[in-house]
Amino acid sequence: MSVKGLNLSASAGKIPQTIGYYLAFIALGLSTASLGPTLPGLAEHTQTHLSQISFLFTARSLGYLFGSMLGGRLYDRVEGHPVMAATLILMAGMLILVPLMPLLGLLTLILLVLGMGEAAVDVGGNTLVVWVHRHQVGPFMNGLHFFFGVGSFLSPIIIAQAVLLSGDITWAYWMLAFLMLPMVAWLLRLPSPTSQADSRADPPGQVSHYPTSPLGSIGSEARQRLLVALIAFFLLLYVGAEVSFGGWIYTYALALGLSGATIAAYLTSAFWGALTLGRLLAIPIATRFRPRAILFGDLVGCLVSLSIILLWSKSLVAVWLGTFGMGLSVASIFPTTISLAERRMPITGRVTGWFFVGASAGGMTLPWVIGQLFESIGPRVTMFTIMADLIVAVGVFALLMRFSPEPAAP
C-alpha cells in the first residue's frame, strides 16, 4: 500500500527505530523547555539577578553550536544508537546537576555541556531518521519534530507540578532526568541504521536521485558545499525568527500595553501550541506536497501573520491571530528543509551538523539584536526585525530553488 509515493509496508519494518527517535525528541523537548520556567528558581539558588542568569541561554546556545559540529562527525564514524543513548545519559546527568549548582559560573558550565548534549541528540535524530526512511522521510521528519513539540509542551507542566508538590525546582529537574532513562533503554536494544555517506553513487543502471543544476559545471563537491551553505544560512534565518518571536512576544505585548502578564504568558503558550499543532498537521501534508511547495506556503504564512500584527499593532485580537498564524506557519519549516536537502544531496552526520551550526547561530544572534534595539527604538522593532529576517529568508529560498531544481519523484 502507498500514499502518494509513501510505501507504508516498507516503512512498517522501520517503526521501532522511528519510535526510538520520537522518544529521544520528547526527551529533547523536555530538556530544551526547562530553562525558561525555572529561571527565577535558578536565580534564587545562585543568589543572582535575572539579568545575570539570562546568560544561561547564551551558554546553552554556545554548547549547541559546539555539539552540532562535533556530533555530526561522530554519527558518521560510530554507530548512531549508542551515541544517541550516551548523549541522553549525559543530558540526564546535567539536568540532575543543574539545581545543585550554588554558583553562576558552575551553572553556566553545566548549561554549556547540556547544550552540547541536546545538539548531539538533535543532529542524531534528524540524521538517523533520514538514513532509515531515505527518500520517503518527509512525514516521518515532521513527526519527529512534532514529538519535540510534545516534550516542550509537557516540560513546563511537569515542572509546575513538581514545584507545587515539593516547593522547589530541584525535583522538577530530577523528574525530567529520570524520564530519559526508558528512552535510552529503547534505543540500545535496536540496531543502528546504515549511513547515507556511501549513497553518492547510484547503482549501475539507476538514474541519479540528485538533480543536475546550473552549478553542475563547477563540480558536484563545490555544488554540495554551496547548497549546504545556503541551507545552513536559511536555517539561521528561520531559527532566528522562531526563537525571537517565541522569546519576545511576551515582552512585546506587555511593553505595548496590550495585555497583562497572564494574557502575555498565554500568548507565548499559544505560539508554541500552534507550532506543535502545525507539526502534527504537517505529517499528512508532507505525503501530498513536495518540500518546496510546503516551504513556500510556510514563508507566505509567516509574512502574512507578521503583517497582521504590524498593521493592527494596537489590537490584541490581531496579535492573537498573528501569533497563532506564526506558530502554524513556522512549524514545518525545519523538518521540511531537511527533507528538501535530502532530495538534493546525500545527508551525512557532518552535513546535518553544519545545518545545526547555522540554526544555533540564528538562535543566538537575532534575539540578541532585538534585545539591543528594544528599549532604544521601541517594542515594534521586534516584529520589524523578524519581518526583515524572513524577507531575507525568502531570497535565500529563491536562490536554493534557482541553483538546485526539484528532482523527479522517486
Model regions: which residues?
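Extracytoplasmic gate region of multi-pass secondary transporters
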Residues: 35-36, 224-269, 273-277
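Intracellular juxtamembrane helix-capping segments at the cytosolic ends
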Residues: 120-133, 331-345
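Helix-loop-helix hairpin linking two adjacent transmembrane segments in secondary transporters
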Residues: 135, 143-195
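Conserved MFS/SLC helix-loop-helix module at the cytosolic interface between two early adjacent transmembrane helices
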Residues: 66-105
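Helix-to-loop junctions at the C-terminal end of transmembrane segments
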Residues: 67-79, 278-291, 374-375
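C-terminal transmembrane helical hairpin of 12-TM major facilitator-type secondary transporters
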Residues: 289-337
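Cytoplasmic helix-loop-helix junction between adjacent transmembrane helices
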Residues: 110-148
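Helix-breaking motifs and short loop linkers at transmembrane-helix boundaries and internal kinks
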Residues: 47, 79, 100-105, 134, ...
